[in-house]
């Protein structure tokens, strides 16, 4: 069996729930593991492999919303976790940040996987703004910690759910939308490397794009008719549940499948390159499927987003924004402790405060180099946790 072995590890209550929803969707070619400190809650996880961690420390009663307990529990059970991950080529670690087990244990699980040489991807959620402030503080700390121990990290702010669902949508239905990002990431990558195609992509291509690349953007789009490729690729790069764009990405995988033409492939690749910039390394895959009459599906995985910070594109980890500032000042470290004002700065062309339309260059941005960056209108909002500093 030459197929890459992919494992999804759901850590804590939210992680276990995400695994359950993926199992319900019957995603093939993936192994699932449920990890929790709460013995009773763990029994509700449908994963074939269940790991109760920190049994001596927590007595099976959970982490009590204390990340330090979750961390110690994972460290206590490190041998069991490593044994469960043995033989994997790629591991997705998913959790809801802000509580005890997910926030504390997920970075430990990720570190164990990465130390074993496994390509490790984190997919985590941030709490709703209406939740306790302490929970958000825990979440942001947890995101910083897991980021140190994964090759690639995808952050899903739960507040984004409020923008895409109506008022009558139930809580379970809304949270299922967040889990769809994880599902798309896993399904998209398994299809890339396990399904034969006209232009084939393999696990080595995935490693090239995702190994040690930091913050990532992933999306899947569908289209029909004459403009199906453009319709699908726009949907994929916008990913409404993420706060990232592909602007300034260093590496991008584009995989297009369906009833596709050469023109469709060219349209999709050209659009992505226009957004990401001339220096982006694009790896392209294509799978022709005549059964999908006049329709196509496009998967876009963009990584290395923070590497372009010096070119004026600052990725929004944990709800940050793409601040319009001189590129010489835009480094990840310089953002820490900055006193950021909530009013939009005036550009050199006197257009301060005017939000650009989506998928358009930001007018008047300071350009030491040729920058083809675009940000969505919503990305100009200054996050609450930075305003409070």
Please provide the spans of the model-predicted regions.
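Tubulin/FtsZ superfamily GTPase core signature
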Residues: 1-389
């Amino acid at each position: 069996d030459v197929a890459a072995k992919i494992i999804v590890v759901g850590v804590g209550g939210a992680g276990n729930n995400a695994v359950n929803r993926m199992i319900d969707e019957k995603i093939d070619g993936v192994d699932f593991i449920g990890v929790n400190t709460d013995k009773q809650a763990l029994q509700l996880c449908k994963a074939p492999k269940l790991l109760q961690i920190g049994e001596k420390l927590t007595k099976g009663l959970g982490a009590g919303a204390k990340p330090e307990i979750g961390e110690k529990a994972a460290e206590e059970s490190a041998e069991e976790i490593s044994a469960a991950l043995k033989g994997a080529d790629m591991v997705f670690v998913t959790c809801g940040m802000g509580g005890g087990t997910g926030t504390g244990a997920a970075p430990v699980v990720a570190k164990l996987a990465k130390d074993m040489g496994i390509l490790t991807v984190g997919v985590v959620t941030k709490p709703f703004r209406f939740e306790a402030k302490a929970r958000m503080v825990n979440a942001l700390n947890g995101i910083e910690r897991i980021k140190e121990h994964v090759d690639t990290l995808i952050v899903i702010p739960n507040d984004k759910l409020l923008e895409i669902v109506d008022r009558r949508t139930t809580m379970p239905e809304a949270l299922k939308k967040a889990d769809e990002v994880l599902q798309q990431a896993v399904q998209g990558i398994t299809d890339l490397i396990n399904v034969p195609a006209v232009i084939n992509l393999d696990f080595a291509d995935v490693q090239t794009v995702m190994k040690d690349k930091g913050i990532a953007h992933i999306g899947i789009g569908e289209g029909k008719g004459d403009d199906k490729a453009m319709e699908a690729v726009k949907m994929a790069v916008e990913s409404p549940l993420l706060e990232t764009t592909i602007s300034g990405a260093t590496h991008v995988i584009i995989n297009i499948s369906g009833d596709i033409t050469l023109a469709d492939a060219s349209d999709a690749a050209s659009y992505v390159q226009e957004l990401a910039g001339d220096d982006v390394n694009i790896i392209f895959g294509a799978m022709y499927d005549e059964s999908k009459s006049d329709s196509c599906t496009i998967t876009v995985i963009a990584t290395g987003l923070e590497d372009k910070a010096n070119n004026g594109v600052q990725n929004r980890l944990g709800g940050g924004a793409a601040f319009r500032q001189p590129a010489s000042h835009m480094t990840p470290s310089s953002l820490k402790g900055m006193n950021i004002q909530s009013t939009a700065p005036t550009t050199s062309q006197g257009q301060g405060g005017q939000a650009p339309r989506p998928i358009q260059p930001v007018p008047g941005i300071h350009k030491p180099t040729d920058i083809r960056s675009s940000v969505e209108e919503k990305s100009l909002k200054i996050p609450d946790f930075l305003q409070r500093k």
